[in-house]
Amino acid sequence: MLTSHFPLPFAGHRLHIVDFDASSFREHDLLWLPHHDRLRSAGRKRKAEHLAGRIAAVHALREVGVRTVPGMGDKRQPLWPDGLFGSISHCATTALAVISRQRIGIDIEKIMSQHTATELAPSIIDSDERQILQASLLPFPLALTLAFSAKESVYKAFSDRVTLPGFNSAKVTSLTATHISLHLLPAFAATMAERTVRTEWFQRDNSVITLVSAITRVPHDRSAPASILSAIPR
């Protein structure tokens, strides 16, 4: 499969972005994956996306001297080497991965159309969150896509500790040109309730990328700093 890779520094980490041509995918491209047999029943598009994600992950792992391919767990989650955390995401013809020594979550989403945003908004945000998104002055489809993506990133960062929390288990508390903050509710995980997560974001073409790598250890307070992460100039 034809791919191109480039690293991108962001929020104190290095993202590994792989653009790929799914039409060039061939079945034998999967053979270098240790778990290729488990992908046998997947569709062609899914196979291409999975392959691109693992290619990005291999580039990320090489940064820390690891030369293995992340396996696939019982829930189809990536299996990272001991002592490391990682995250993979893909959308359309782009996959990306990041590696860290602390919990991390990353997500990429195509910016919703106005019609899609109007249709999906009630399942992603509540009325309070809608007001925050509208107050950001970002176009609503972009703001809603960011809310969706940020919640996905937070789930990925803690996927081994939570079981498919709904979108109403984390609430948007602020949205700026560089970050979106979320307040975790008991429905997310009782042990993390009333904590705040700040997710960094940027736009790449018609997609957004969100990344979370820290959670505050203090109760939610809108007047207090939301994260130990620094904002990234854009």
Curated annotation (Swiss-Prot):
Keywords for this protein: Enterobactin biosynthesis, Magnesium, Membrane, Metal-binding, Transferase
Binding residue positions for Mg(2+): D107, E109, E152
Keyword hit for Ribonucleoprotein: no
One term of GO molecular function: holo-[acyl-carrier-protein] synthase activity
Subcellular location(s) of the protein: Membrane
Catalyzed reactions per annotation: apo-[aryl-carrier protein] + CoA = holo-[aryl-carrier protein] + adenosine 3',5'-bisphosphate + H(+); apo-[peptidyl-carrier protein] + CoA = holo-[peptidyl-carrier protein] + adenosine 3',5'-bisphosphate + H(+)
Record pathway: Siderophore biosynthesis; enterobactin biosynthesis
Major localization listed first in the record, in broad terms: membrane
InterPro entries membership: 4-PPantetheinyl_Trfase_dom (IPR008278), 4-PPantetheinyl_Trfase_dom_sf (IPR037143), 4PPT_N (IPR041354), Enbac_synth_compD-like (IPR003542)
Class in the EC hierarchy, top level: transferase
Any one biological process term the GO annotation gives: enterobactin biosynthetic process
Family classification: Belongs to the P-Pant transferase superfamily. EntD family.
Binding partners and assembly: EntB, EntD, EntE, and EntF form a multienzyme complex called enterobactin synthase.
Role of this protein: Involved in the biosynthesis of the siderophore enterobactin (enterochelin), which is a macrocyclic trimeric lactone of N-(2,3-dihydroxybenzoyl)-serine. The serine trilactone serves as a scaffolding for the three catechol functionalities that provide hexadentate coordination for the tightly ligated iron(2+) atoms.
Protein's name in the database: Enterobactin synthase component D
